[in-house]
């Protein structure tokens, strides 16, 4: 805080100085009392000041111009920035009274000095120079002080803009923010060199939170300035989140069931929509690893949908949907449960069309990555070690698996909506490619929930729903449940039993001759590799290498799947037979399947009791078989 002391005026006016103030002026006791009557009345808003011409004319160019005619005794300053409070301080300064310049009044005094033309042209050490000195020494070097003064400038438009005070404060905030970022980076570098894992924490009075007091226009200008100065995207994201939470406090609704209970008036919706659209424009650059949290993007999208009444927010909505789609693998179920706009004619609880676009964006991005990887391989040497991006443990495949699990959970959630049409559900269920799901249990659960909630759908729709499920990817528990599920069509139950029988047969065949089975069962899937020089001439080395990689991936997956299936079979093939027999003893289909299971069981027992070449017991033979298969994978 600064204290400005004004020296005595000219000796000719060092005698008694009289004031007669209107009753509307507070703190009248602070003014010196004089027997000299006032010769000027200044009207500022609803307040009147009975003053003397000479002190004001000696320091204010505007008052001097207004009093060019000596007969004038009344002046109206209706547009004075800061109102009567700022003018009172300026008048006291003209009379030589000590006034305190601080964070709360510096903006008013600076604008008042500009409006009253209290510059050095009329008096030395005038109010304009005093306030400028305070700004340079106390305000501009501090981010927090600059933000506070900038906030006070909001009520001083257009004078604060005319004297360039707003722009200078914004530049000061941007420059100091980047300096602080550089200092923080050097501090982290010192920590890393010293081997200390402790990093400086964000202070509780972090300047980014203070920006929430600014109006939308000033806030937007500050963010644009710090972006141009190179402030990192993580900090910008935190600032945007803090400002949004403060500006829209109580308006963000995450639970779609509560959305219908909240009604905003048209003015509130308009204000909310304007804030959200501005925040979306200020978001950092789009990317698959964006610094903007998924939960924040989802909240913005929900608010855009809730407040939009037409296609006016189309670009904003598309931008948010693309951002969410780019990092969909980071989303949770709550992020994609987007409520429908209540103004529409759709009675469903969730916005299915928006989710279809979001998942499509992610899948298209996945295809673009594959093309980029294929293009990248053209310039790589065949013998060079490269990462297998399509393997189950790769980051790319891991993202696809996360998205597929998210889709299954989403389908299970929206399946409970009684107004959801079958076509919408099927469109979502068929959206993901086949390789996105290693196991189809989640999709089966969602379909079963939908059939339970919608028991009156047509048989054709029921059949189309079940066609989205890959029966070969169902687990043993899911197969057992599906075989007894009366909500499924007969074709689905038969298909499940058929593939279960095939898996049993393949597993037992592999126990007899694993190597022969592998190559016989997959010969139709893998292209024939040529070992001669003539054959290799027809295929380029790049295509041949890609084919070998694909064959190895599929072979490893098949061997791993069969190993797991065989282990489960040895433990559970007896219980499967008992469960199928108990489920419906009167059904010929299950009886016949039980008989086949018995035959397969006897065959499996016979094959396991066959003497091995080494003469060991059946348990040792199985152990030897497992060891051989493990070596074959490596």
Swiss-Prot record:
Sites where Phosphotyrosine occurs are at 444
Question: For this chain's UniProt record, which GO biological process terms are given?
Answer: pollen tube growth; protein ubiquitination
* Alphabetized PROSITE patterns for the sequence: BTB, NPH3
Domain NPH3 stretches: 205-503
Domain named BTB: residues: 38-103
Keyword Coiled coil assigned to the entry: answer is yes
What keyword terms does UniProt attach to this protein? Coiled coil, Phosphoprotein, Ubl conjugation pathway
Q: In which pathway does it act?
A: Protein modification; protein ubiquitination
What superkingdom does the record give?
A: Eukaryota
Q: Which family does it belong to?
A: Belongs to the NPH3 family.
- What does the comment on domains in this protein's record state? The BTB/POZ domain mediates the interaction with some component of ubiquitin ligase complexes.
Q: Give a short account of what the protein does.
A: May act as a substrate-specific adapter of an E3 ubiquitin-protein ligase complex (CUL3-RBX1-BTB) which mediates the ubiquitination and subsequent proteasomal degradation of target proteins.
User: Would you tell me the protein name for this molecule?
Assistant: BTB/POZ domain-containing protein At1g03010
What is the source species?
A: Arabidopsis thaliana
């Amino acid at each position: 805080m600064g204290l400005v002391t004004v020296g005595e005026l000219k000796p000719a006016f060092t005698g008694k100085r009289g004031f007669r103030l209107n009753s509307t002026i507070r703190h009248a006791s602070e003014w010196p009392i004089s027997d000299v009557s006032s010769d000027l009345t200044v009207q500022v808003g609803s307040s009147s000041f009975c003053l003397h011409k000479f002190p004001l004319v000696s320091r204010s160019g505007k008052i001097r111009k207004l009093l060019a005619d000596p007969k004038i005794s009344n002046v109206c300053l209706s547009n004075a920035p800061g109102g009567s409070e700022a003018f009172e301080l300026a008048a006291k300064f003209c009379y030589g009274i000590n006034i305190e310049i601080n964070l709360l009044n510096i903006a008013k005094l600076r604008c008042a000095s500009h409006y009253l033309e209290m510059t050095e042209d009329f008096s030395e050490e005038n109010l304009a120079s005093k306030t400028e000195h305070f700004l340079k020494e106390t305000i501009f070097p501090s981010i927090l002080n600059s933000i506070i003064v900038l906030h006070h400038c909001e009520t001083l438009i257009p004078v604060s803009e005319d004297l360039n005070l707003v722009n200078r404060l914004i530049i000061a905030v941007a420059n100091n923010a980047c300096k602080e970022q550089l200092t923080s980076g050097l501090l982290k570098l010192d920590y890393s060199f010293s081997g200390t894992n402790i990093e400086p924490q964000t202070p509780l009075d972090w300047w980014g939170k203070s920006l929430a007091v600014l109006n939308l226009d000033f806030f937007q200008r500050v963010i644009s300035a710090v972006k141009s100065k190179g402030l990192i995207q993580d900090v910008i994201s935190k600032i945007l989140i803090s400002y949004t939470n403060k500006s829209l406090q109580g308006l963000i609704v995450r639970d779609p069931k509560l959305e219908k209970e909240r009604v905003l008036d048209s003015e509130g919706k308009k204000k909310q929509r304007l804030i959200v659209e501005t925040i979306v424009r200020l978001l950092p650059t789009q990317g698959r690893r964006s610094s903007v949290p998924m939960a924040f993007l989802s909240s913005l999208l929900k608010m855009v949908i809730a407040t939009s009444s037409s296609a006016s927010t189309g670009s904003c909505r598309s931008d948010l949907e693309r951002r969410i789609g780019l990092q969909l693998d980071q989303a949770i179920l709550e992020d994609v449960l987007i409520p429908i706009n209540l103004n529409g004619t759709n009675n469903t609880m969730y916005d299915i069309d928006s989710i279809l676009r979001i998942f499509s964006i992610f899948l298209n991005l996945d295809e673009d990555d594959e093309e980029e990887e294929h293009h990248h391989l053209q310039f790589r040497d065949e013998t060079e070690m490269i990462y297998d991006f399509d393997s189950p443990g790769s980051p790319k495949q891991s993202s696809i698996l996360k998205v597929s699990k998210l889709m299954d959970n989403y389908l299970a959630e929206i399946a409970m909506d009684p107004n959801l049409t079958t076509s919408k559900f099927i469109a979502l269920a068929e959206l993901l490619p086949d390789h996105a799901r290693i196991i189809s249990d989640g999709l089966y659960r969602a379909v079963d929930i939908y059939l339970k909630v919608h028991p009156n759908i047509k048989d054709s729709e029921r059949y189309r729903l079940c066609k989205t499920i890959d029966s070969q990817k169902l687990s043993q528990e899911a197969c057992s449940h599906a075989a007894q599920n009366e909500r499924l069509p007969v074709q689905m139950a038969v298909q499940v039993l058929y593939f279960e029988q095939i898996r049993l047969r393949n597993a037992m065949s592999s126990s007899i001759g694993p190597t022969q089975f592998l190559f016989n069962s997959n010969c139709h899937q893998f292209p024939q590799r040529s070992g001669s020089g003539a054959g290799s001439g027809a295929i380029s080395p790049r295509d041949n290498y890609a084919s070998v990689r694909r064959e190895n991936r599929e072979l490893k997956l098949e061997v791993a799947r069969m190993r797991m299936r065989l282990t489960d079979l040895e433990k559970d093939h007896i219980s499967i037979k008992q469960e199928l027999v108990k489920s419906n003893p009167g059904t010929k289909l299950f009886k016949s399947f039980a008989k086949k299971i018995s035959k397969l069981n006897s065959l499996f027992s016979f094959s396991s009791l066959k003497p091995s070449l080494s003469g060991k017991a059946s348990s040792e033979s199985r152990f030897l078989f497992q060891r051989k298969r493990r070596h074959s994978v490596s």
